[in-house]
């Protein structure tokens, strides 16, 4: 028995069950991924014990020479990975990364232009229930009702009318390529700054499979998990002229001591992302997403914008008897994890929704490829054709578990 199993069997049991879920269920939540053993080893290290307020070479605590090495490695690797002037690897999350940028260049009441949450944006891009919507005057933009892609005519019209100080680009449920050059051109017409939140597509950007926002934006924020396949955390890239202000708005502005064990895990993940194999992995994520999207559409599912260019897709259930909530629950019983999601021009509550979101990063980390995506589409269709049929859903779960058993990832942790 492990030390944890001996001392706290309740926690140990929960961890084991979650390991089994990640090993044998099909994880299709677009914002989730599975890290490498090296990343987990770094995150579970003694660095969790060390306080290190400040920045490398300028700490408020002694004994930081080793963690300085780790943070500098993370910074330099991040800059190399994305071609950035400056990187701050201390944000605990993507939300805090966004907050730090806002506080660096905005005052309460300033106007920002951000993507409507129900059209695919993110809470921190100006949702009224989030700090971003409470502190700032938010003008939301969205997608065209015809194409379900970003309506740049609307973005330009709103920018000219409201003269935002900052235009926020990025999304949590947008399956198409983001045109950073178009946003930059609009921002320049009104003298606005640009912040790109590339949390969902950072891995694709690092691999050159999605245009980089770095040349077009004063600030680029991201999480370090999702497609980047690192630990749960955040990061900010910016132009050198904003580096000092940005750093001070992370610490002491909105955070105290950085999480050095997480920064170590970020450093390891960035090294992985700099390796040639990472591009092949990202290419497979996109191939899997496109195959799955095509197969779902063949089976009669409607996808927002008619497909995907990246790692995710949004299934629109409008006009069917299903809701996103019902679909999520049925698929969960079939061993397939997705999340209910609002769709553009949503008519239902965000607790119910008319759609669900699917992503391929975690399944790709397991080793699934195009052939398996054909099977996955069949599993999804079978489960959603049998909502309420517990026996049939259990049968589908058996097929899912058998499929995932062919692609072990953390099996050694279950011995």
Curated annotation (Swiss-Prot):
Keyword annotations from UniProtKB, A to Z: Amino-acid biosynthesis, Cytoplasm, One-carbon metabolism, Pyridoxal phosphate, Transferase
InterPro entries hit by this protein: PyrdxlP-dep_Trfase (IPR015424), PyrdxlP-dep_Trfase_major (IPR015421), PyrdxlP-dep_Trfase_small (IPR015422), Ser_HO-MeTrfase (IPR001085), Ser_HO-MeTrfase-like (IPR049943), Ser_HO-MeTrfase_PLP_BS (IPR019798), SHMT-like_dom (IPR039429)
Keyword Transcription on entry: no
Listed Pfam families: SHMT
Modified-residue entries (N6-(pyridoxal phosphate)lysine), positions: 226
CDD domains in the cross-refs: SHMT (cd00378)
EC number(s) given by UniProt: 2.1.2.1
GO molecular function annotation: glycine hydroxymethyltransferase activity; pyridoxal phosphate binding
Top-level EC class as recorded in UniProt: transferase
Site (Plays an important role in substrate specificity) residue list: 225
Catalysed reaction, written as an equation: (6R)-5,10-methylene-5,6,7,8-tetrahydrofolate + glycine + H2O = (6S)-5,6,7,8-tetrahydrofolate + L-serine
Top-rank taxon, per record: Bacteria
UniProt-listed SUPFAM superfamilies: PLP-dependent transferases
GO terms under cellular component: cytosol
Compartments reported by the entry: Cytoplasm
Binding site for (6S)-5,6,7,8-tetrahydrofolate: 117, 121-123, 241, 349-351
Record has Aminoacyl-tRNA synthetase as a keyword: no
UniProt cofactor(s): pyridoxal 5'-phosphate
GO biological process: glycine biosynthetic process from serine; tetrahydrofolate interconversion
Assembly behavior: Homodimer.
Protein task: Catalyzes the reversible interconversion of serine and glycine with tetrahydrofolate (THF) serving as the one-carbon carrier. This reaction serves as the major source of one-carbon groups required for the biosynthesis of purines, thymidylate, methionine, and other important biomolecules. Also exhibits THF-independent aldolase activity toward beta-hydroxyamino acids, producing glycine and aldehydes, via a retro-aldol mechanism.
Family per similarity comment: Belongs to the SHMT family.
Protein name from the UniProt record: Serine hydroxymethyltransferase
Organism: Geobacter metallireducens (strain ATCC 53774 / DSM 7210 / GS-15)
